[in-house]
Design a protein with these regions (language model features):
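Negatively charged, low-complexity tracts enriched in Asp/Glu with abundant Ser/Thr
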Residues: 1-21, 48-62, 66-75
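Acidic, low-complexity, intrinsically disordered interaction modules
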Residues: 23-54
Length: 75
């Protein structure tokens, strides 16, 4: 992902943490790795719905959403 695009994604995000940008989509969440550009869609239940991330990145994305949900929802 280009630096310019990563900056745009980060600016639009509700939360940026450890290189991952999280954006609410209704009750669900979009998570983008700002370095690789890979993304995940995490359901309101905390379960992973779709991703092009590897297993480790997917786990990180889910953990970020689940552990920081109160900050994302308050945004």
């Amino acid at each position: 992902m280009s630096e310019e695009k990563a900056s745009e994604v980060a600016e639009a995000a509700d939360l940026v943490l450890n290189g991952y940008a999280v954006t609410r989509d209704g009750e669900n969440f979009r998570v983008v790795n700002l370095y690789s550009g890979k993304a995940a869609y995490v359901m309101a239940s905390g379960e992973l719905s779709e991703t092009n991330m590897d297993e480790v990145e997917s786990e990180i994305a889910c953990r970020i959403v689940n552990e920081n949900r109160r900050y994302i929802v308050a945004a």
